[in-house]
Amino acid sequence: MIADSIRIDTARIVLHYSGNASEQERIYHVKVVQDSTTAEEGIHYQPIQKEQVFRPGRLTDTLKIVVLRDNMNSRFLDKERYRLELELEPSEDFDLGIRQGIRKTLWLNNYMSEPVWWEGNFHGRLGFFHPEKWKILINWDKEFANQDKCKYDQNNRGQDYYNTLRSYINNDANAVYDEDGHRVYFDHVEVPEEE
């Protein structure tokens, strides 16, 4: 989870080098696939240099994409996101080993989207995903803040967390509300009938 005050963020794409690590830096090319991309350069992300460097002595390196959050909606209910389709291209000293190149899709958004582990680690026991529920878990234990992995699951302390979350969020003394002022419960969001 990233603080609202941070307006520029960096997405990192890990690249793997096959074979032995090179003793010299290697140049590879990255291009934005325009017909598959909805994100706009200079609005949603900073320009990406075509030539990128794979550092010497490494089998992995990282392509960094600078994301601009100011022009993206932060409302979870709207789920506004932009697609950035990237393609690696070979260069004189960096062969991809795949004739048609390698593509990677990066989805850019400015809201808390469901972490990878939400369903898998807990087999649905955390109920539907809502950012307010995730914020509570993070407040209790920073281990929950990682989007990609969580050390807890239904077989360890995770069971205590989801049982406590259910009791906590359903208790009127701990009421939490979504961005439209609707009460968030463990298993639903209360929306007035007139809406």
Predicted features along the sequence, with ranges:
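Short proline/glycine- and polar residue-rich coil/turn motifs
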Residues: 52-61
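Short edge beta-strand/strand-turn motifs with a hydrophobic/aromatic core
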Residues: 63-71
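Intrinsically disordered, low-complexity regulatory regions in eukaryotic proteins
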Residues: 1-28, 33-46, 70-195
